[in-house]
């Protein structure tokens, strides 16, 4: 009996020693934590963060310049305030990596596809030819919006009746149509099976990410292997996209040196980028899927937030409608016209300020040990981010920060300083899209598409919430933010401009 007791005490002593060693050698122990930080009990902090990330990030932001929060298997360091956001942006790429941070947080090799994760052919295409050619491509986006809304909105709305619409689902379908008009063109952008594949894939990434991040790192390859959505999407999308790829490549080969009739569109640019980097053309299918994830998931959430605000604050509809009507009459449905809609731009930027897609941004993984200006030491391997929502609701940067003021940014703009406050721009105080050279490259396409959709809705529909219903609170799971599942009432109206 005494021998057994000795063994038990010895085992407890060993465990206590290991516990102390792990705690004392934690390279981030010097950074204040929100919640329990000791080994094992830190899992309680991870559980709290899953359920209450918004309040935890706010608490840390107001207490510390730099703090940490717990995920299941790691600590994430968070910097607070505009100055620290700017400092994080300026750390050179030799010392930190955006891509590795995104890989860790989104688990790209499991949630999307390993090939395009390693060779992101879509990124230079989005940064380069897509953004440069937005003006030329914009009429196709507008045309698809004009076709998609009448087809996908309930028939009762067309008869002048108020009808409840599941906004996020409907907007996701319309975003997918408009985006794929650019990604793959007609007629595939209207193919129901193809659209079902890309929409389901876009929303499965968030689902997969949540499942994988809930597992300890050692089990993630196993969990990732059994998640079916990415593999299924690559297979199903390939059925539709591969024939287009083969057709384009064959046409290029037949033309030889004379490429004057070569297609000049997103799919062609992806094919050229794959060939330039000597990748198998199968990666083009993955590039199309990644582009759809970025376009559909984020954009459908963003326009849903904007519509919820439009329905919740109907007093702002008329000034928006008057602005849109006047500009469309003068400039037509052009990219130039969209750029002149300052009130609409402000409305949507303000919506994004309070309802982004994440409570964190400007994510980086430390490649070489660094020390921040406040003296905080970050060792290699640290994941560090900026507190986006807390920055956006900081009274040092925004008057009445908790209040939705749709024309906040419109009032800040002047003719000589018009660009700095527009929806697409980032700053140290506005980091929804990230900040600096690693800010979301697709935001220029997305913002023009979303503003065109909102302009169409404001001209062609009245919207409101159901009687007695106020603007629902956003849903936070970890630091990810989604609009609540709710319906908005739509009624078609006769637009004064076409």
Swiss-Prot record:
<dbReference type="GO" id="GO:0019748">
    <property type="term" value="P:secondary metabolic process"/>
</dbReference>
<dbReference type="GO" id="GO:0005506">
    <property type="term" value="F:iron ion binding"/>
</dbReference>
<dbReference type="GO" id="GO:0004497">
    <property type="term" value="F:monooxygenase activity"/>
</dbReference>
<protein>
    <recommendedName>
        <fullName>Cytochrome P450 monooxygenase 71</fullName>
        <ecNumber>1.-.-.-</ecNumber>
    </recommendedName>
</protein>
<feature type="glycosylation site" description="N-linked (GlcNAc...) asparagine">
    <location>
        <position position="425"/>
    </location>
</feature>
<dbReference type="GO" id="GO:0016705">
    <property type="term" value="F:oxidoreductase activity, acting on paired donors, with incorporation or reduction of molecular oxygen"/>
</dbReference>
<keyword id="KW-1133">Transmembrane helix</keyword>
<dbReference type="GO" id="GO:0020037">
    <property type="term" value="F:heme binding"/>
</dbReference>
<dbReference type="InterPro" id="IPR002401">
    <property type="entry name" value="Cyt_P450_E_grp-I"/>
</dbReference>
<keyword id="KW-0325">Glycoprotein</keyword>
<keyword id="KW-0560">Oxidoreductase</keyword>
<keyword id="KW-0408">Iron</keyword>
<dbReference type="GO" id="GO:0016020">
    <property type="term" value="C:membrane"/>
</dbReference>
<comment type="function">
    <text>Cytochrome P450 monooxygenase that is able to use dehydroabietic acid and testosterone as substrates for oxidation, suggesting that the natural substrate(s) may be structurally related to steroid compounds.</text>
</comment>
<keyword id="KW-0503">Monooxygenase</keyword>
<dbReference type="InterPro" id="IPR001128">
    <property type="entry name" value="Cyt_P450"/>
</dbReference>
<feature type="transmembrane region" description="Helical">
    <location>
        <begin position="7"/>
        <end position="24"/>
    </location>
</feature>
<feature type="binding site" description="axial binding residue">
    <location>
        <position position="440"/>
    </location>
    <ligand>
        <name>heme</name>
    </ligand>
</feature>
<keyword id="KW-0349">Heme</keyword>
<comment type="pathway">
    <text>Secondary metabolite biosynthesis.</text>
</comment>
<dbReference type="Pfam" id="PF00067">
    <property type="entry name" value="p450"/>
</dbReference>
<dbReference type="InterPro" id="IPR036396">
    <property type="entry name" value="Cyt_P450_sf"/>
</dbReference>
<keyword id="KW-0472">Membrane</keyword>
<dbReference type="InterPro" id="IPR017972">
    <property type="entry name" value="Cyt_P450_CS"/>
</dbReference>
<keyword id="KW-0812">Transmembrane</keyword>
<comment type="similarity">
    <text>Belongs to the cytochrome P450 family.</text>
</comment>
<keyword id="KW-0479">Metal-binding</keyword>
């Amino acid at each position: 009996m005494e021998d057994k007791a000795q063994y038990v005490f010895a085992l407890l002593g060993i465990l206590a020693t290991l516990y102390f060693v792990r705690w004392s050698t934690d390279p981030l122990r010097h950074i204040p934590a929100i919640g329990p930080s000791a080994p094992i009990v830190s899992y309680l902090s991870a559980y709290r963060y899953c359920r209450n990330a918004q309040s935890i990030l706010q608490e840390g932001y107001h207490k510390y310049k730099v703090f940490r929060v717990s995920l299941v298997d790691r600590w994430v360091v968070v910097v607070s305030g505009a100055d620290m956001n700017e400092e994080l942006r300026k750390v050179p790429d030799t010392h930190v990596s955006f891509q590795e941070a995104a890989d860790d947080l989104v688990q790209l090799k499991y949630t999307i596809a390993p090939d395009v994760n390693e060779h992101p052919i879509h990124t230079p295409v989005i940064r380069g030819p897509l953004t440069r050619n937005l003006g030329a491509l914009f009429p196709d986006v507008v045309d698809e919006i004009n076709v998609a809304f009448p087809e996908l909105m309930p028939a009762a709305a067309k008869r002048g009746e108020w009808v409840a619409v599941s906004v996020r689902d409907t907007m996701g379908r319309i975003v997918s149509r408009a985006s794929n008009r650019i990604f793959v063109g007609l007629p595939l952008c209207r193919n129901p099976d193809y659209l079902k594949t890309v929409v389901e894939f876009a929303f499965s990434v968030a689902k997969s990410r949540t499942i994988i991040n809930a597992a300890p790192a050692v089990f993630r390859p196993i969990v990732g292997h059994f998640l079916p959505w990415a593999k299924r999407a690559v297979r199903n999308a390939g059925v539709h996209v591969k024939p287009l790829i083969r057709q384009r490549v064959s046409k290029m080969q037949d033309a030889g040196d004379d490429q004057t009739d070569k297609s000049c569109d997103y799919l062609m640019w992806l094919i050229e980028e794959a060939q330039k980097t000597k990748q198998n053309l199968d990666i083009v299918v993955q590039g199309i899927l990644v582009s759809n994830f970025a376009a559909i998931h984020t954009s459908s959430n963003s326009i849903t937030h904007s519509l919820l605000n439009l329905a919740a604050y109907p007093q702002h509809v008329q000034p928006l409608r008057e602005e849109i009507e006047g500009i469309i009459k003068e400039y037509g449905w052009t990219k130039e016209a969209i750029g002149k809609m300052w009130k609409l731009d402000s409305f949507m930027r303000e919506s994004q300020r309070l309802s982004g897609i994440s409570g964190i941004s400007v994510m980086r993984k430390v490649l070489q040990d660094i020390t921040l200006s406040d003296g905080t030491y970050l060792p290699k391997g640290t994941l560090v981010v900026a507190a986006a929502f807390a920055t956006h609701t900081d009274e040092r940067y925004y008057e009445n920060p908790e209040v939705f003021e749709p024309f906040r940014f419109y009032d800040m703009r002047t003719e000589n300083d018009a660009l700095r406050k527009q929806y697409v721009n980032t700053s140290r105080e506005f980091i929804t899209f990230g900040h600096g050279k690693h800010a979301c490259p697709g935001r220029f396409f997305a913002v023009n598409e979303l503003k065109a959709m909102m302009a169409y809705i404001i001209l062609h529909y009245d919207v409101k919430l159901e009687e007695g219903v106020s603007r629902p609170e956003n849903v936070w799971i970890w630091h990810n933010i989604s609009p609540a599942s709710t319906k908005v009432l739509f009624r078609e109206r006769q637009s004064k401009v076409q």
